[in-house]
């Protein structure tokens, strides 16, 4: 006596398509919600930013400014130099001081950009800073030197406008946390160089 085996029920193709569609719509909805949250948070970011660090150097400003005015000397103290020793460097304009220019092109660690000194005194060295990649932007930066009892207070600051994309980036990356430690390292290197030139 033969027994009939019940065949397994087949899922209708339309039901499968319905499940896939539901999953896709859910993922799209989550993505849209995520983007909405990011844009909402980005809109609360300030219109400008400023990163600043200071140290006291046991030396007068006259022994600090030569390391700032001559862009070729930045290789001796800049914290970014060691990140890509093979980066391309190009110097133009004045030999030092106002009008001196320095362009770099490196790997993903430092990107590409250029610097031009716009003010150079024993109290302040200011320069424009243009990044070409990984994200194009223009900022201003300066070193100020203030006499103190124990030497010179050296302050390094960078400031600029927060573009829309800049605000979005700052949802995930804090400018102060990202640049502050490198400013501290650069100031420490300058401090040691000024001591050696004593």
Identify the role of each PLM range.
Residues 10-90, 94:
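Hydrophobic ligand-binding cavity/cleft-lining segments
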